[in-house]
């Protein structure tokens, strides 16, 4: 398990909420809170610093790279649209066997859930592992690095599979050892979203974070409890 790599996919160029990954949340930035939380995982290795930020090579992300360097985060840059290629570039440079894919607009990824998911991935010898029925934005995905390299080499790979890194695996589960875990009971609240896509999401998350005392270490289960006390919260998922 020494060659695990956490990869946080982040960029400044969101169409609905530009610059969201560096927006303030309490006294910190969204990205900084996420990095802090991931570093609480039992699988984070401080001596190796097995966490990187993968951003684009667009000029608009120069400010993000500068922020990462200032904060001491390892940062890699690659294609903005061909995100799979960006990940492969990181994999070829660092050479992990397993990656944990995270996105910079999910500041409340829970380290306990990360540990459950990663351990299950190894225990079951899976190719891909994901947690079901948790709030959107608190998990991430575990995937064997060689799979992403293999997928990137598929002839005439559709654009959607370049943009969405693990979508090919999810759309072709018969080809891989895919594991979908049920969220532990205290995290089981699929009706909520703890991700930031829009200005409304951001304002809702800010309000929730304030209620939680603006603590970077707050458990996702505690946030769920706060949301349960306010069933009309704007962070509820819209019905399909």
UniProtKB/Swiss-Prot annotation:
GO cellular component terms attached to this protein's record: cytosol
Lineage: superkingdom: Bacteria
Pfam family, one: CTP_transf_3
Pathway: Spore coat biogenesis; spore coat polysaccharide biosynthesis
Protein family per UniProt: Belongs to the CMP-NeuNAc synthase family.
Entry protein name: Spore coat polysaccharide biosynthesis protein SpsF
Lineage: Bacteria, Bacillati, Bacillota, Bacilli, Bacillales
């Amino acid at each position: 398990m020494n060659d695990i790599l956490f990869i946080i996919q982040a960029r400044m160029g969101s169409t609905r909420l530009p610059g969201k990954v560096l927006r303030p949340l309490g006294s910190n930035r969204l990205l900084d809170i996420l990095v802090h939380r991931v570093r609480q995982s039992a699988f984070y290795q401080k001596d190796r610093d097995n966490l990187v930020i993968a951003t684009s090579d667009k000029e608009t992300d120069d400010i993000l790279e500068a922020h990462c360097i200032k904060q001491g985060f390892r940062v890699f840059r690659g294609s903005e649209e061909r995100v799979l290629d960006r990940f492969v570039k990181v994999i070829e440079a660092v050479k992990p066997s397993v990656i944990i894919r995270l996105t910079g607009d999910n500041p409340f990824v829970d380290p306990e859930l990360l540990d459950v998911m990663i351990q299950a991935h190894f225990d079951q010898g899976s190719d891909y592992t994901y947690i079901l029925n948790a709030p959107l934005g608190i998990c991430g995905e575990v995937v064997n690095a060689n799979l992403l390299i293999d997928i990137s080499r598929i002839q005439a790979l559709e654009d959607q599979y370049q943009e969405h890194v693990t979508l090919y695996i999810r759309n072709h589960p018969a080809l891989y050892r895919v594991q979908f875990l049920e969220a532990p009971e205290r995290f089981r609240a699929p009706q909520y979203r703890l991700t930031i896509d829009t200005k409304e999401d951001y304002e809702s998350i800010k309000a929730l974070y304030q209620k939680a005392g603006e603590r970077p270490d707050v458990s996702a289960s505690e946030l769920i409890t706060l949301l349960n006390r306010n069933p009309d919260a704007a962070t509820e998922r819209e019905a399909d």
